[in-house]
């Protein structure tokens, strides 16, 4: 059964904040609560806190320990696979020491014991004691891996236009119901300390691509979003979910996320490589580029062209007004052959090579039904001196050229490169 709570949901966990009103006696107020063993196993160790009054102590213990103590001196059976049941008496509950009917003593596992009395459910009892003089209003807080969220995006392209739709997928992987009067979503990089003391950095959506719950239509049309942006908190994006929410055990809830606006949408092909003297051939990669009107957290993205699925990938976190470039994979309809020709060498009077000039050519062939813009980028390492006759500086430069390849046609890109002797 769930408690009335406030929820703060992060990429890989949720913070539960349970409002409480406690009455104090002799300067102390106490709250006790029982968690099922399954729920407790998902709670981050050391995350239990109380806000609203000074904490005196927070204790937790298995609920079955007290009951086991009442069974000391009572007959039990030991059940082991492939063996006949053993009759015994429980001697000590703390380490499950039993005395066999034959007189020997044996420590056993909890799962091996059968009792004549009905045992309680496995769970953990939590006791919070705070300093207070009268009534105190506060919150019991803990973090649980049962709760998380991620944005899911769908880019629908047609002609020269594209629209980006977004859903917020909220998950409850646990067996408890959460009834939240207030719910907030946080996105961004969250650094946590594990129980072993190691730092881990989690990014919204990381490792979750493809784990989507509700299928989307060819053109994802969404109602008004209940999610409102609240700005940022120390580099984390913060959103409020209007009206709170109720999450049942195992539920995945999808609601419309922020309404994203796009400008500058374009499709193009890209060829990227590095300079060497070898001939190469291959395929260009398919790229979509656009500029979002607002910052968006990272999340899985489905791309559709006139309703047809053409790719899925993880969209990186975006910043308002900064272009986003998406690589959808190789384009079988757009291929290239790269050739390199040595044009000249410069030597000193002693015959030592000072520089060598090369011509690099990309011959592009398209079997596509429309003209396509192709961007060729080549990384040059070593001692580049000039590109197309223009002097350059640095040990690493990028030679970049663009060309339009006609439908069902060919085009070429050429540049010259002067390299100093290594």
Regions found by a protein language model. Give the residues of each.
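Long, intrinsically disordered, low-complexity accessory segments associated with secretion
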Residues: 1-422
